[in-house]
Structure formats: C-alpha cells, structure tokens
Amino acid sequence: MNIKDIARLSGVGVSTVSRVINNHPDVKQSTREKVLQIIKDSNYIPNNSARILKQNNTKNIGVLVKGVFNPFFSEMTNIIGNIIEENGYTMILQQNDFNLYQDVETMIGFVKEKRLQGVICLGGNFTEIQEDSFEDIKVPVVLTSVNTISKKGKKYYSSVGIDNSKSAYKAVRYLIERVIKDCFGLGEVNDLGVSWWRLDGYKKALGENNIDIDDELIISGEYNSGTAYENVNKLLKKRKDITAIFALSDIMALGAIKAAIDNGLDVPRDISIVGFDGMDESKYYNPSITTVKQPKKKMAETSVELLFSLITTDGENKHVILDTELVERDSCFNI
C-alpha cells in the first residue's frame, strides 16, 4: 500500500493525501476524515516527519506556497505533487500566507526542518534577494510565479514564470483598442514582485496611448474577491466615468464584476473587465471573464523538471519565461 493507493481509494489526488498526512489546513474536513479513515483501515504508515528524521538520505521535495487558497496555485500544487510522487519522492507542502515579510528566511527554515532534497516556491515575497541570500541553502531552489525587481543572486536559484509586464501591457492595450478612456487598475500596489510588474505593463500601455495615469484609478487590495468587490464598489460610487477595469488576478475580477452589476452597470456594455491567470472558473462565470491565461500546467511541469535536473546532475540554474495567452470571452466589449 502506498500513497497512490490511498489517493485512489479516497477518490482524491496524491497531493490531497499528502496535505492530509502533513496536517495542512487547505483540506475540507469531510475529505480529511475520509482519507484518514482509509489510512487507518489500510494500516498505511505515512512517510511523515518522525520517519524523515531517522533517515540520512531523504527523498523529500518541499513546496512552499504563498496563496495556497488561490485556485491558480492549488491547481499547480496538484500537478507538482503528482509528478513528485511519480518520481519516487514525497512532497512536503507548507503554506506561507501569514508571513508579511521576505520569504527567504521562511524557505531556509523549511529546508532545514524537513531535511529537503530541494524546494519549489509558488509565489512569495523575494523582492530583496541579495548575493548571499542563499548561503544557508545547500539544496536546489526553484522560484515559480515569483517576479523580483532584484537582479542579484540569480545564479543561486532557478525560476519559472511569465513576462508579467508584457502580458499586462497586451491586456490593457486590448481594452484601449475598444475605445476605452478611463481604465481602472486593481491590484496589490505595495507588492514589489508580480503585482509591480503587472502594474508596470498597465502604466506602459496607458502612457504609449497618451492616456494620463490617474493614481486614484490604481487601487491596492489583497488578492481576493471580497476586497476587490469593496474597492470597486467604493470607486464606482465616486467615479461614474470608469469604462474598464484591469484586475491583476481572476479572483479580483470576480469581485469587480459583482460590484459593477450591483452598481447597475452592464458588463460589458457599460464597463469592460479583464482578469489575469486564466483559472478554470473564469470561463464559467456570468459573464465569462476575458483573461490573461498563464500556462500553469507547463509552469508546474517545468518547475519539477528543473528541480530534478539540479538534484540528479548538479547542473546550472536556469530561468525560464513562458508565453501567456489573452483569452477573449464575454466580460469585454466587442468592437
């Protein structure tokens, strides 16, 4: 009996079983109870921390997630977990949502505590990486969907991501081409990573089309629908001239659409909204969301491939940039 058998009997993914074993909070209580009962009935002994500490040569890969409740990262975690298990390793998942500061120290502690062979970081605050930031980490590191304004220390880690500035630029240009005058940017303004680059693309698109950048139309907020709804609701009550919203994530776009509708606006006739990420739920919303689709499956697969390459061959670190796709749906006005 192995973890794949437990997953099959439970009707869930391998990564879900791994989260249950590691007592991760991102599991429904009913699912947790079902998996634990099957583990008990099967007399399955998990390769947990107690066993890890007895081993000199562990085969554990850490996945450190900032935004574990974000569907985008949840889907990537499942893909990564399955590949890790298929290669004979165990995924140790740890969420990092409550650390508001730099995540390098968190990663160092994670590697040492769990005695990892390597670590993949999904999201996170790595904006102040220095040349000596990875001195205490003796295992391969892959930063995925992590953009940093720092160019230092890149030879000490690998990365997988997209060109966030270029992708955001294309999305805002798409809005502008639909004769939109006042475009509202919705994101995490104080984030100097992914959000910084997406707002950079937003500003470039406005500037190149001779549209003034109105600071009142760049609203900071957490990456969730509730905060987005509150921020858009407040702005629309003050500004009746808004004709477009560029949301830095699909989750934010969901809240923005609800706020627009609650303010009596028709989406997209009165206001157009574009999201970012391309999460699966975006195509089932009403209206379905025009979005910048990230290649999450390819990002997840490439992250694990890079990590295993570094573990098995001791090769050089690489930095991979993948293409995005602007998916046209119903939340934008069609010319």
UniProtKB/Swiss-Prot annotation:
One of its GO terms (molecular function) is DNA-binding transcription factor activity. The keyword Electron transport does not apply. PROSITE patterns: HTH_LACI_1, HTH_LACI_2. Transmembrane segments: none annotated. Gene3D superfamilies: 3.40.50.2300, lambda repressor-like DNA-binding domains. Keywords: DNA-binding, Repressor, Transcription, Transcription regulation. Residues 1-55 form the HTH lacI-type domain. Residues 3-22 bind DNA. It holds the Pfam family LacI. The keyword DNA-binding applies. Repressor of glucanotransferase gene expression. PANTHER family: HTH-TYPE TRANSCRIPTIONAL REGULATOR EBGR, LACI-RELATED TRANSCRIPTIONAL REPRESSOR. This is HTH-type transcriptional regulator MalR.
